[in-house]
């Protein structure tokens, strides 16, 4: 153990010397070599499934999860591909494999540490405040530690690792949503939950700063979904007071304001980091508005006129029931998931994720926008057809 520890210490000391190299601060076209991903179920491509007790598997271990594209469960929290999958395809990469439990996986073009149920803050910190959750103990800090410990296996030398990190698109989430979800679901009031926001933002910022110190150059940092449009929250906070609902979307206005509160603070912190590290590209992914537009104009995007009910759940006005246990009760699903925005009441369908990814990659929901002008014509041709497949 001591020998391994000293090897890791030596590795990072050498790596840090390479990270002192001056980087051109001029904006450059984004031509990535790989994807490094952290986050929760929005980006999890199989990590929670790999970490789970075989006698108590999560719902993503079973159909109908994965039915649309893969035709079998993969550990993804959807009927098909996720935003991270569409990003990988857009860049001409294979789908990013999960890190945990992967045997003989090829991480040359990407590695994913995102885990379903993960939080930004440490589990012990949340539990001290009465916020309990059963799913995972893999916080953002744990994911980052796993990444650092894996570097000697992902690259052959400190200079090679620096090159890999510098030329990767680093996807920082979405992360933090579960910190709020768990707090809401145990009955914390809005003011108590607002107190978590600066702590979540600080945790995300610290992780970005640490990765910058390791050579990270381009970060895609998503904001929160509009919680007031979430089927889970619409079911939990259902009310007869029509004034609480947005008349256009049917979303709960006060919950969407909370999401906006988080996103405003996150963007302010990202702006601070960008000024502090002008040689780094920090891109904000506006998950809030790219998803909200699907509720505002569902027909425009091919969805049913009432887009909020879940495709695949267990009844109720929004086809969703809180508290369903792992692996229990196979839900009844809609005939055509491509017509629905919400998959299971918490996560989106592949159709919704495709449109969200397109809004981030092609605009206008990435701030600042990506510059893809230097990509090869082969990849550009793939991009032109990707979103229609």
UniProtKB/Swiss-Prot annotation:
<keyword id="KW-0964">Secreted</keyword>
<keyword id="KW-0443">Lipid metabolism</keyword>
<feature type="active site">
    <location>
        <position position="344"/>
    </location>
</feature>
<dbReference type="GO" id="GO:0005576">
    <property type="term" value="C:extracellular region"/>
</dbReference>
<protein>
    <recommendedName>
        <fullName>GDSL esterase/lipase At1g28570</fullName>
        <ecNumber>3.1.1.-</ecNumber>
    </recommendedName>
</protein>
<feature type="glycosylation site" description="N-linked (GlcNAc...) asparagine">
    <location>
        <position position="137"/>
    </location>
</feature>
<dbReference type="InterPro" id="IPR001087">
    <property type="entry name" value="GDSL"/>
</dbReference>
<keyword id="KW-0325">Glycoprotein</keyword>
<dbReference type="Pfam" id="PF00657">
    <property type="entry name" value="Lipase_GDSL"/>
</dbReference>
<comment type="similarity">
    <text>Belongs to the 'GDSL' lipolytic enzyme family.</text>
</comment>
<keyword id="KW-0378">Hydrolase</keyword>
<dbReference type="InterPro" id="IPR035669">
    <property type="entry name" value="SGNH_plant_lipase-like"/>
</dbReference>
<feature type="active site">
    <location>
        <position position="347"/>
    </location>
</feature>
<feature type="glycosylation site" description="N-linked (GlcNAc...) asparagine">
    <location>
        <position position="319"/>
    </location>
</feature>
<keyword id="KW-0442">Lipid degradation</keyword>
<dbReference type="GO" id="GO:0016042">
    <property type="term" value="P:lipid catabolic process"/>
</dbReference>
<feature type="active site" description="Nucleophile">
    <location>
        <position position="41"/>
    </location>
</feature>
<keyword id="KW-0732">Signal</keyword>
<dbReference type="GO" id="GO:0016788">
    <property type="term" value="F:hydrolase activity, acting on ester bonds"/>
</dbReference>
<dbReference type="InterPro" id="IPR036514">
    <property type="entry name" value="SGNH_hydro_sf"/>
</dbReference>
<feature type="signal peptide">
    <location>
        <begin position="1"/>
        <end position="25"/>
    </location>
</feature>
